[in-house]
């Protein structure tokens, strides 16, 4: 369903965002 798609998109966005940060130190 649409909710499942949103969930997958959100997880993908978070994963891409984390990779974009390049492992910046989390404070």
UniProtKB/Swiss-Prot annotation:
One Gene Ontology term from the biological process aspect of the record: defense response
Keyword entries, A-Z: Amphibian defense peptide, Antimicrobial, Secreted
Record bears the keyword Nucleus: no
Subcellular location: Secreted
Superkingdom, taxonomy of origin: Eukaryota
Tissues showing expression: Expressed by the skin glands.
GO annotations of cellular component type: extracellular region
Main location: secreted
Similarity comment: Belongs to the gastrin/cholecystokinin family.
Main function: Antimicrobial peptide.
Name of the protein in its database record: Caerulein precursor fragment R5
Native species: Xenopus ruwenzoriensis
């Amino acid at each position: 369903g649409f909710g499942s798609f949103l969930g997958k998109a959100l997880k993908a966005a978070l994963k891409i965002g984390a990779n974009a940060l390049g492992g910046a130190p989390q404070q």
